[in-house]
Amino acid sequence: MLDKVKNVIIVLSGKGGVGKSTVSTQLALALRHSGHKVGLLDIDLCGPSVPFLLGLEGSNIYQCDEGWVPIYTDASKTLAVMSIGFLLKNRTDPVIWRGPKKTMMIRQFLTDVKWEELDYLIIDTPPGTSDEHITVMECMREVPCNGAIIVTTPQSVALDDVRKEITFCKKTGIKLLGIVENMSGFVCPNCTNCTNIFSSNGGVELAHLVQIPHLGTLPIDPRVGVLAGSTASVLDELPDSPTAQVLRGIVQHLVALT
């Protein structure tokens, strides 16, 4: 039930391991930090990471007459979270489902979760363009969707897959809000200097080539990794870090669009 949700943002990646779930989680926390009520929906059925990243593993969800009730991270209900990870007994339990069952579960997540009034719903998707993505795009025809953010790393092999993701969005009619280049450079935890250990600016160049916004470049920062397993926002814990600066810019961009 998305009738109380004002804005829906989908987070995509062409390849796994680019930090999409971390970006989704920190984006949700940054929006909450900015005074918005936020929902975070994890539809990566085979690799749900959001419960771990927010330290919510072991949380139990229950159903009411209106559907599943999401997990709230605080008493004020400023961040609501839903994931298949809450339905698994153990984090290591695999989800061995064929396409139709995955489709049914995602439709339930999109239609049978009792979201309260939300300013933003962030949908964290699995990598690639699979049944999960097609189901989401079909459901978004019935519910207004602001668009998609694509997360990539600067290497050319990741950028090739991003091009496929861009084509997928165009064919399904989803607006592209921009590209985030993640893992671009390494921030030394001692001196905070940033060193490019991979190629750099691939996301910037691709955004320019396909004429969509480049939302920012996020480095590898061990200090940010330490925040995994908690509901602490980079904006609170590391306000002067490069990651915090980029997240502020993305939030400002989204707010301006919506």
UniProtKB/Swiss-Prot annotation:
GO terms for molecular function: 4 iron, 4 sulfur cluster binding; ATP binding; ATP-dependent FeS chaperone activity; metal ion binding. It is found in: Cytoplasm. GO terms for cellular component: cytosol. PROSITE patterns: MRP. Binds 4 [4Fe-4S] clusters per heterotetramer. Contains two stable clusters in the N-termini of Nubp1 and two labile, bridging clusters between subunits of the Nubp1-Nubp2 heterotetramer. Its main location: cytoplasm. It holds the Pfam family ParA. Keywords: 4Fe-4S, ATP-binding, Cytoplasm, Iron, Iron-sulfur, Metal-binding, Nucleotide-binding. One of its GO terms (biological process) is iron-sulfur cluster assembly. ATP binds at residues 14-21. SUPFAM superfamilies: P-loop containing nucleoside triphosphate hydrolases. [4Fe-4S] cluster binds at residues 188, 191. Its cofactor is [4Fe-4S] cluster. Belongs to the Mrp/NBP35 ATP-binding proteins family. NUBP2/CFD1 subfamily. Component of the cytosolic iron-sulfur (Fe/S) protein assembly (CIA) machinery. Required for maturation of extramitochondrial Fe-S proteins. The Nubp1-Nubp2 heterotetramer forms a Fe-S scaffold complex, mediating the de novo assembly of an Fe-S cluster and its transfer to target apoproteins. Heterotetramer of 2 Nubp1 and 2 Nubp2 chains. PANTHER family: CYTOSOLIC FE-S CLUSTER ASSEMBLY FACTOR NUBP2 (PTHR23264:SF19), NUCLEOTIDE-BINDING PROTEIN NBP35 YEAST -RELATED (PTHR23264). This is Cytosolic Fe-S cluster assembly factor Nubp2 homolog. It comes from Drosophila pseudoobscura pseudoobscura (Fruit fly). The lineage of its organism: Eukaryota, Metazoa, Ecdysozoa, Arthropoda, Hexapoda.
